A protein has these predicted regions:
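Short, glycine-/aromatic-enriched active-site segment of Class I SAM-dependent methyltransferases
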Residues: 178-195
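S-adenosyl-L-methionine
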Residues: 103-157
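Conserved S-adenosyl-L-methionine
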Residues: 96-104
Length: 263
């Protein structure tokens, strides 16, 4: 009986739209071959094998969907890259990076025992729990991509640290969370929810201007397709380091939070 790579067979059977998608499904543990979970896209299987695809959640948490949106919007490929994930928590971002072929991910979080067991057992993941990223002077190696999904801390505190970790030409994908950037008074007034477009613009301009001063060049900015806790709007910013902004910051912010929406 002839054999074929599993990822190729998934596409031929119409169970995946592309080999890249097939590889992500396999690496996420969502594919069974004759009833057994397969974890290697290159696995050689007989062409008449029984294939099952579990199309449940792609990632261990909804955070992975946020990063997925950024990778698609900015056309970023984490394949074979050394990455760091700040605020890893359950591991949604880390999972997304791995499923897109990251060579290694430093999963950093102040909590303990939160990272999903699947990721803990993945040899590509370096678990750095009970670790506050702001105090990490250097990682064991330079990274080419840093992702940030941090809570209760401003990006203005983290960005000066991240630039030390990055290799020249490295990139950062960061969730900008107005509830942690607008200040205690604004957050308290809205019971932890920042709803005013005026404040969204103010926060974004503040963070992006600071990033520019630190040598980060803004390459793209989009609104996250998923809301944060309590319904907070969040934004995904793409930076390169070192670099300059691709356009006027005020104009880039206005595209994401239009001025006509002001109260």
């Amino acid at each position: 009986m002839p054999k074929m790579r599993l990822d190729t067979l998934l596409v031929e059977r119409g169970l995946a739209e592309s080999r890249a998608q097939a590889q992500r499904l396999v690496m996420a543990g969502q594919v069974r071959v004759d009833g057994q979970v397969a974890l290697k896209p290159a696995l050689s299987v007989v062409t008449n094998a029984r294939l099952e695809v579990d199309l449940g959640p792609r990632y261990v948490s909804r955070g992975g969907e946020k990063l997925q949106a950024a990778l698609e919007a900015f056309r970023i490929d984490p394949g074979n890259r050394i990455c760091a994930d700040v605020g890893a928590s359950t591991g949604g971002f880390t999972d997304c990076l791995l499923q897109h072929g990251a060579r290694r991910v430093y999963a950093i979080d102040v909590g303990k025992g939160i990272l999903h067991w699947k990721l803990r057992q993945d040899p590509r993941v370096v678990v750095m729990e009970e670790t506050n990223a702001r105090y990490i002077r250097a990682l064991p190696e330079k990274v080419s991509l840093v992702t940030v999904d941090a809570a209760f801390i401003s990006l203005k505190i983290l960005l000066p640290v991240l630039r030390v970790w990055l290799a020249p030409g490295g990139e950062a994908l960061a969730l900008v969370k107005p509830q942690f950037e607008a200040g205690r008074v604004a957050a308290t007034r809205g019971q932890g929810v920042i709803r005013e477009p005026r404040l969204h613009r103010q926060v974004l301009l503040g963070v992006l201007s600071f990033a520019d001063q630190q040598g980060f060049g803004l390459q793209g900015l989009v609104r996250s397709p998923l809301l944060g806790p309590k319904g907070n709007a969040e934004f995904l910013a793409w930076f390169v380091y070192p670099g300059g902004a691709e356009g006027d910051l005020s104009e880039l912010v206005a595209r994401v939070v239009p001025l006509e929406n002001s109260p």
